[in-house]
């Protein structure tokens, strides 16, 4: 993974993980996968969620499960796609909830969520790579251990963060977060399969900003 870099603050926090045997095995697995098959995102974007949202600047964490696995979609940020790529259904539903919740259209660049990242929104997938057209193909190889360590580091070393946990997989991560120190907001996944079961109407975006303001933190322009 020579192309990969990670922001200095995250590197300091996660150095113990880099030094563990599971991460060495994970690195070997991912390197071999990139050698043999089309893998997403491009290798230079594996740690992009961390690189674009420094540890000390995180205000909000949105958890995804897997990168997009079709050509041109994955850019290393959960739910985000590059500008010019058609907006996937889950992201379309996120934008719809923002519009009804805040009364404003989503402040994004096409389907790219970089405008959020630049304000301190960490868009973290639990698994950071995937084989083309094979959803979940890189689960169970160590990425989840690594990203759990990142979530735990934020939960223990920072305060007054907002964790947006959408869907049953993300909601299980609440066990790592102290609700006395952070705001945890849970809802069904924004996928068309589940958005009507409680994602629509959850008002997570206005509730996030109310909490941030309450603690003297600049709100997110969603």
Swiss-Prot record:
<dbReference type="GO" id="GO:0005737">
    <property type="term" value="C:cytoplasm"/>
</dbReference>
<comment type="similarity">
    <text>Belongs to the uracil-DNA glycosylase (UDG) superfamily. UNG family.</text>
</comment>
<dbReference type="GO" id="GO:0097510">
    <property type="term" value="P:base-excision repair, AP site formation via deaminated base removal"/>
</dbReference>
<dbReference type="Pfam" id="PF03167">
    <property type="entry name" value="UDG"/>
</dbReference>
<keyword id="KW-0963">Cytoplasm</keyword>
<keyword id="KW-0378">Hydrolase</keyword>
<dbReference type="InterPro" id="IPR005122">
    <property type="entry name" value="Uracil-DNA_glycosylase-like"/>
</dbReference>
<dbReference type="InterPro" id="IPR018085">
    <property type="entry name" value="Ura-DNA_Glyclase_AS"/>
</dbReference>
<keyword id="KW-0227">DNA damage</keyword>
<dbReference type="GO" id="GO:0004844">
    <property type="term" value="F:uracil DNA N-glycosylase activity"/>
</dbReference>
<protein>
    <recommendedName>
        <fullName>Uracil-DNA glycosylase</fullName>
        <ecNumber>3.2.2.27</ecNumber>
    </recommendedName>
</protein>
<dbReference type="InterPro" id="IPR002043">
    <property type="entry name" value="UDG_fam1"/>
</dbReference>
<feature type="active site" description="Proton acceptor">
    <location>
        <position position="66"/>
    </location>
</feature>
<dbReference type="InterPro" id="IPR036895">
    <property type="entry name" value="Uracil-DNA_glycosylase-like_sf"/>
</dbReference>
<comment type="function">
    <text>Excises uracil residues from the DNA which can arise as a result of misincorporation of dUMP residues by DNA polymerase or due to deamination of cytosine.</text>
</comment>
<keyword id="KW-0234">DNA repair</keyword>
């Amino acid at each position: 993974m020579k192309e990969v870099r990670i922001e200095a603050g995250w590197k300091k926090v996660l150095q113990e993980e880099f030094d563990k045997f599971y991460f060495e095995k994970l690195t070997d697995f991912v390197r071999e996968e990139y050698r043999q098959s089309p893998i997403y995102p491009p290798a230079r974007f594996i740690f992009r969620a961390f690189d674009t949202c420094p540890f000390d600047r995180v205000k909000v964490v949105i958890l995804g499960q897997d990168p997009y696995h079709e050509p041109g979609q994955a850019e290393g940020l959960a739910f985000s796609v590059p500008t010019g790529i058609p907006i996937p259904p889950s992201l379309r539903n996120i934008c719809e909830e923002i519009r009804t919740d805040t009364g404003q259209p989503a402040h994004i660049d096409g389907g790219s969520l970089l405008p959020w990242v630049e304000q301190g929104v960490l868009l973290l997938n639990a698994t950071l790579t995937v084989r083309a057209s094979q959803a979940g193909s890189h689960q169970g190889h160590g990425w989840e251990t690594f990203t759990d360590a990142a979530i735990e580091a934020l939960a223990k070393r920072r305060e007054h963060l907002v964790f947006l946990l959408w869907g049953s997989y993300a909601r299980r991560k609440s066990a790592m977060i102290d609700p006395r120190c952070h705001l945890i907001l849970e809802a069904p996944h924004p996928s068309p399969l589940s958005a009507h079961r409680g994602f629509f109407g959850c008002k997570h975006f206005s509730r996030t900003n109310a909490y941030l303001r309450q603690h003297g933190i600049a709100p997110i322009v969603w």
